[in-house]
Amino acid sequence: MSDYVYELMKQHHSVRKFKNQPLGSETVEKLVEAGQSASTSSYLQTYSIIGVEDPSIKARLKEVSGQPYVLDNGYLFVFVLDYYRHHLVDEVAASNMETSYGSAEGLLVGTIDVALVAQNMAVAAEDMGYGIVYLGSLRNDVARVREILNLPDYTFPLFGMAVGEPSDEENGSPKPRLPFKHIFHKDQYDANQHQQRKELEAYDQVVSEYYKERTNGVRTENWSQQIETFLGRKTRLDMLDELKKAGFIKR
């Protein structure tokens, strides 16, 4: 791996303010093709990408997300787990393929495929000089997103991605990640609680200092406090029901 690629990936951070400069159709096509070059399990290609250009559709999706950059960006992509085309093949096939794509394993396979495509696109966009931000907030109301985007059965909107030229006011920076030794385990998982807690305490201090410096002391919370706040909300508890309605996790 070249130093350029390494530094490009290490400098990733979410961009939430964009210039009013739409991406051209050629750029959009290149990004999608770069995404499609990602690995795909068993050549299934279990994804579709919806490019949202209509301002009225963007506005409706913004209502679901609650984030202004769903509307104000260079381009909005929505990444869809898609077994609809496989269902069409299944209708004329001799075997019952729904047993596979309607299973929990089918969901995992498809979701991984979508994530790989999206990350390929993210890196390609950043290489072009654009900023990106992922939009898991589109899952705030899956049923409404399905209606807005006219999604058929056997599809599921996983997340969006806003892309565009970063605003001159944009001053984001990469957040410190968990240290290498904490997330990389040789041969077997190291579940030593004492060691893990010790490493987390050190990481909490790093994160707290990062926020303190970035905000002139306005924010000082650490990583453990953040995940306690986020995971303690117990949001989107309807997801299993929504997945089943779309034809997933039948077994």
UniProtKB/Swiss-Prot annotation:
Pfam families: Nitroreductase
Class of this enzyme: oxidoreductase
TM ranges: none
Requisite cofactors: FMN
Record InterPro entries: Flavin_OxRdtase_Frp (IPR016446), Nitroreductase (IPR029479), Nitroreductase-like (IPR000415)
Gene Ontology terms, MF aspect: oxidoreductase activity
Source organism superkingdom: Bacteria
This enzyme's EC code(s): 1.6.-.-
Gene3D superfamilies: NADH Oxidase
Keywords from the named record: Flavoprotein, FMN, NADP, Oxidoreductase
Similarity-based family: Belongs to the flavin oxidoreductase frp family.
Function recorded in the entry: Reduces FMN, organic nitro compounds and disulfide DTNB. Involved in maintenance of the cellular redox state and the disulfide stress response.
Protein name: NADPH-dependent oxidoreductase
Species of origin: Staphylococcus epidermidis (strain ATCC 12228 / FDA PCI 1200)
